[in-house]
């Protein structure tokens, strides 16, 4: 027959009672807090580095744009007139093609 003492031992094995003291809980919380602070510092450092890299990249792009603007040569009046003549010529060709198509359609 199983004694009461043995039944209690079996119950303890099946349902162990875990005792956690207040000090243990505090230690766990402090450890988690330190880990969180360390992660926050690491993430903040990475964020600041990324932010700095983006600033540097934007600054370089701005310098390139300024350099491009300084070296840009506006087209002379002669070039503008030549481009205008080419566009007028192309418009005339298109109109002639349309007129030709209309005449063919009539016939």
Curated annotation (Swiss-Prot):
Source domain of life: Eukaryota
Compositional bias ranges of the Basic and acidic residues kind: 35-45
Keyword flag Coiled coil: yes
Coiled-coil intervals, chain numbering: 26-107
Chain positions covered by the region annotation Disordered: 30-52
Keyword terms, alphabetized: Coiled coil
Protein name, per record: Putative uncharacterized protein DDB_G0280941
Species the sequence originates in: Dictyostelium discoideum
């Amino acid at each position: 027959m199983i004694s009461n003492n043995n039944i209690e031992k079996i119950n303890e094995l099946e349902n162990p009672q875990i005792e956690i003291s207040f000090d243990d809980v505090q230690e766990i919380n402090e450890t988690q807090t330190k880990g969180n602070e360390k992660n926050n510092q690491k993430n903040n450092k990475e964020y600041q580095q990324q932010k700095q890299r983006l600033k540097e990249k934007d600054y370089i792009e701005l310098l390139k744009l300024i350099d491009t603007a300084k070296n840009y040569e506006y087209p002379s009046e002669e070039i503008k007139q030549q481009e205008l003549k080419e566009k007028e010529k192309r418009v005339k060709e298109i109109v002639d093609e349309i007129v030709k198509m209309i005449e063919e359609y009539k016939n």
